[in-house]
Amino acid sequence: MVYWFDSHPIYYWIIAWISFGLLGCAALLPVAVGLFSEKIEQRMLHFLPRWLFMALAALCLFAFRWPTWYVPKEFNPDESEFLAEALTLQHRPVFWGAVDGESHGPLDVFPLCLLRGVGLKYDFFGERLFGAILMLALIFGCYRALAAYARESVARAAVLPIMCMLVFCSFWDFVSYSSEDVPIASLAIGFWLLVSDLARPLARRRWSARWIAGGLLLGAVPMAKLQGGPASAALLVTCAVCDLCHGGIELRIRVHRTLVLAASSLATTVFIVLLTWAFGALRHAWLSYVIQNLNYTQAANSPLYMIQHFWEFVQQAVELSPYLVGVAIVAALSLMIALMAPASNVRLAVLALVFLAASLGVAIAPGRFYPHYLLFLIAPAGVLAGALWVAGWQSAERAPQAPWVRAALLLLLLGALVCPQIVARATHPHPYLGQLRSIESLANDPVTIEIRRYGHPGESLGMWGWMCRYYAYTGMWQATRKAHTYKQITPSPQIDYYRYRYMQDLQRNRPPVFVDAVGPGNFLYNDRAVAHESFPALRDYIATHYRQMADINGCRIYVRLDRLAQP
């Protein structure tokens, strides 16, 4: 059926746009009717409950995104690396002991280990489906954060631009499973939990599961991607300060709540650190996850350079630049009305501004123009525009012609943030629709076929170079802690440490097949001057224990001698 839809794109578009039409009706009809009759608005919300609204959001997201799930090649080399790490953790579930993410942590990878438990394979389909579910969680977090400070119907309209951005997006680095997916979903849900707790009546704030859960989620972000840590820290500190400065609760209770938030935010990190220490991998975690990431940011473009070239950075992601322009327009025009709102109505906008500023810093801090870093901006930018729009909506209640002012605000939201995204999606072809059969042939890679002659799924695979796709294609786990050898090839103060660790892992796991993926046509490494022979200890080990069996597409395939001796 998938191939039938792919070969008949018109039916794909019909179903996708019908699903969006249903979502648009659920988002906009109640607020539009509410301009003139709150009674009818409430009746409509009764027939369009919250769960149905989110179900329509899921239907719409999946209806537009499914062609990307079936593309049997990596959109980003990181996708194959995540699959390789998940396969390895099934064999030995010790992060930094069996797997080293370097720029990402265990919470980015361990959730992928659940794919097999729900009947999915370790492949690009399951990985991207999980990524889409995380985007749905992000949408839910933004929606409920807005609903904590606005009427249900108004919150639905305010979150629609974020939905459009994630539903219509087909940019390769945004629809792939990336190391940002878990952090941005956690940030959005954690943001909702904390700001919704701050919106609760004072009498109900003493004990709150939301406050603790929000701290746990935001505190877990650095264990998914260390880069996201400053954004989670900024939100935790800002929410704690807002709570401490509120004079309506006893100081003792406010201090207690701050301590509870601090403890919950540290709990996940402390737990993972203790586990890592217990398995003897704490030194590796410190060197690779902390020191390496600090060195990574220092050996790149300066923050000033990134700010000066920020718009060029944004324009790499084709759908993001019009979204951010729309956010700026809605935020600026809504602000003029929102300034007349009560302070409580503007609080969400202030918190969202902190969220956006911290996320902007997170996106540019590494000093590299990698588009997937920009994923950090989608939720906070949309929530800031939505929060100011909501505050303007609430301020308009005092206007002599309140329905007409609100109608103008609704038209502003649609004209600046919703309709441009609809037009862009409707007028641009889907890059992966109608091509599945031709793309599928890419998975029948001759290197993969040759590896499978000697190795089998569930066995380890040795690799020199950066062609992690062969782990994903063969179902074999990585024999060394890292799926590629960037750190073993690139000169750095830590190269001896990484090479020593590489040899330890290779000798311990003794992979039946070793692939030297340095050669013409390979990712990043084409010059065989940096092939495995450039590392004398590895050269001697391979020469002693392996025999070269093929040289295909720039990859030399070696097989362990005792495997060749088997009948």
Identify the meaning behind each predicted range.
Residues 106, 110, 118-140:
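Loop-to-helix entry region of an early transmembrane alpha helix in multi-pass inner-membrane enzymes
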Residues 231-266, 336-343, 383, 389-399:
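Perimembrane helix-loop-helix junctions
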Residues 207-226, 232-237, 267, 356-365:
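Membrane-interface alpha helices of multi-pass inner-membrane proteins
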Residues 230, 360-362, 366-404:
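Hydrophobic/aromatic-rich transmembrane helices and adjacent perimembrane loops
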Residues 24-40, 319-346, 353, 357-358:
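Hydrophobic, aromatic-rich transmembrane alpha-helices
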Residues 142-167, 184-185, 202-205, 350:
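Transmembrane-helix signature of polytopic, membrane-embedded enzymes
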Residues 150-153, 188-213, 244-249, 323-347, ...:
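Membrane-interface transmembrane helices that cradle and orient dolichyl/undecaprenyl
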